[in-house]
Amino acid sequence: MLTSSLLCSALLIAVPLRKELNEGWKFKQARLSNWYPATVPGVVHTDLMDNKIIEDPFFRLNERGMQWIDKEDWIYQTTFQLTPEMMGRENIDLIFKGLDTYADVYLNEKKILEANNMFREWKTSIKPDLKPGENVLKIYFHSPIKVDIPKWDALPYQYEAGNDQSENGGVFNKKVSVFARKAGYHYGWDWGPRLVTSGIWRPVYVEAWDNARINDVFIRQPEVSKSRASLIGEVEILADKEIDQANVTITEAASGRVLAGQTVSLQKGINKISLPFSIKSPKLWWSNGLGEPHLYSFRTDLTVNNQTSDAWTEEVGLRSLKIINRPDKDGKTFYVELNGIPVFAKGANYIPQDNFLPRVTPEQYEKTILDAANANMNMLRIWGGGTYESDLFYQLCDRYGILVWQDFM
């Protein structure tokens, strides 16, 4: 009994530790001195509303009086402490799931990161820059308008950006939205106002880990039929040193059945491991109206020195999905074939649910996808003027049998 307890403790100690940094934030205009409480995740417009500095921009013509906000630089700041257990780990990373958009990140007054893309995650190692006690994290957001106008001025021609409401924004004909890796609709569209945001729009946290960790797992599906699913688990592992022996296993979470396993040596840095496996007579995933959208839960474990260094669980629908584009009497076909069955696509164009994306709750996401399913839709197109949606959005689509046609941004 004592041996079991010790083994469990060792396994727990090896797993990455996480601290969310969602409390104690404050913000201010960079050129002014007054600080105000801030909400993270959030954006500057919602923080200004919460502090009664501006009114609701969606009421009457309030939007017109708020175009000064995107011409200002903004600073967000908080403090945090890590436990001795986290400080004792070999590696400590600061991870931003989303920064909107041009941002310099400082830890204890040292610049550690420059961000320029709201669509991606940002990660940086911070262990050498941490203090044993209180640490100060500061983010300086540059005005996207001030950053991008020089790019517009430098060109002898103009990019097309017909929906950019530059005149409403007070920058005349300078449609700078095309220069930023940022949601296009923030600059105005034919269906919505111009509200160009800045802020920590997705979660931020610190993770501490030893030896190696799983960066990503993708279950590739080369061949799926009702008799057999041939699958490949593509596992990306980050190691902080050369490791002679590590074990990677994939199990079916519900039954605990081991589906694939491999002993590998890891090089320092990124390692990509492929684990082929198969499932006989799989329960297939079907779109809404054609059958049950069954999901398998796969767990991937990484073991180093007989300790679980990391684990990753993901729900996956097993299906064969193809675009059929073959010659016919009118030209070429263009339709979706799911598990060998032609699908009559019924759906809608999905645009972001709010100009201020952090306000969208999990409940709103679920209601939206469930409403689509209840309306007999089986596909949503993610419009290219918005953002790549949250993981929750795609998980709900999987759960309710909704196919996704994903635009690039």
List each model region and its residues.
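Secreted/periplasmic carbohydrate-active enzymes, especially glycoside hydrolases
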Residues: M1-L380, R399
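Aromatic-lined substrate-binding rim segments of carbohydrate-active enzymes
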Residues: M379-M409
